[in-house]
Amino acid sequence: MPERRGIVLVNAVSEKDLGEDKRKREKEKECEKLRKLLVEGLEGFVIDEKVLQAMLRVPRHRFVPEYEQRAAYVDMPLEIGHGQTISAPHMVAMMCEILELAEGHKVLEIGAGSGYNAAVMSELVGKTGHIYTVERVEPLANFAKKNLKEAGYKNVTVLLENGSMGYPGYAPYDRIAVTCAAPNIPETLLEQLKPGGIMVIPVGSYSQELIRVKKDSTGKIYRKKKGDVIFVPMIGKHGFRRI
């Protein structure tokens, strides 16, 4: 009798595990459908098919807290804790298109957040490229590392640092993506951008503008406004508040 009870228990656990696996598979299928609908809606913001395909491959629900799961595929910013947000998908797509990311690029991101933006950029730079993403809030840096690892992104390095100074350790960069608003374009970031490189950065306090910065082969800087935006403020030496 004890042996039979043991067998029944094992079977019960197996059935429970199978049920859990089924629920996970169903959730992934549903998320895939929602992601497809989301990306279809982005076609009014973005025309680069490579960017749209990258957005389609990244499971956004794996990069948001449990309490935001229901809104993972709504085109809106979501809170991720510590006064920070994950950008709306259309903004992520627009910034990636502005950056003109390509296979093999080395990219610096200021503001890792949950790791979602880095994951999308990772898809665009491929296995020969690399994303270095800087996050000043330790719990968020750990959250981003966990999310990226579980989602299988191996060409992304999360660095616990204050990003207002950039990250000279791996400079110069082909591209720089800044996901927090600065009072102006930090000179130190311009110095870390390769000749021929592109940076995208929101500039301003309450009324912000997204700026595309291009450094030509001679080092000359060109700036172009790409629209009004709202981002959390940059904190640090070149931000709105020093720490």
Swiss-Prot record:
Keywords attached to this entry: Cytoplasm, Methyltransferase, S-adenosyl-L-methionine, Transferase
GO BP term, example: methylation
Annotated catalytic residues: S87
Q: Does the keyword ATP-binding apply?
A: no
E.C. number, please?
Answer: 2.1.1.77
State the top-level EC class. Answer: transferase
What span is annotated as the signal peptide, if there is one?
Answer: none
PROSITE patterns, sorted: PCMT
Residue ranges crossing the lipid bilayer per the database entry = none
Enumerate the InterPro entries for this protein. Answer: PCMT, SAM-dependent_MTases_sf
Provide the reaction this enzyme catalyses. [protein]-L-isoaspartate + S-adenosyl-L-methionine = [protein]-L-isoaspartate alpha-methyl ester + S-adenosyl-L-homocysteine
Chief place where the protein resides: cytoplasm
Q: Which GO terms describe its molecular function?
A: protein-L-isoaspartate (D-aspartate) O-methyltransferase activity
Gene Ontology CC: one annotated term: cytoplasm
Q: Where in the cell is it found?
A: Cytoplasm
Q: Which CDD domains match?
A: AdoMet_MTases
Supply the SUPFAM superfamilies for this chain. Answer: S-adenosyl-L-methionine-dependent methyltransferases
* Protein function: Catalyzes the methyl esterification of L-isoaspartyl residues in peptides and proteins that result from spontaneous decomposition of normal L-aspartyl and L-asparaginyl residues. It plays a role in the repair and/or degradation of damaged proteins.
Family affiliation: Belongs to the methyltransferase superfamily. L-isoaspartyl/D-aspartyl protein methyltransferase family.
In terms of PANTHER family, this protein maps to: PROTEIN-L-ISOASPARTATE O-METHYLTRANSFERASE (PTHR11579), PROTEIN-L-ISOASPARTATE(D-ASPARTATE) O-METHYLTRANSFERASE (PTHR11579:SF0)
Q: What is this protein called?
A: Protein-L-isoaspartate O-methyltransferase
What broad taxonomic lineage does this protein's source fall under?
Archaea, Methanobacteriati, Methanobacteriota, Stenosarchaea group, Methanomicrobia
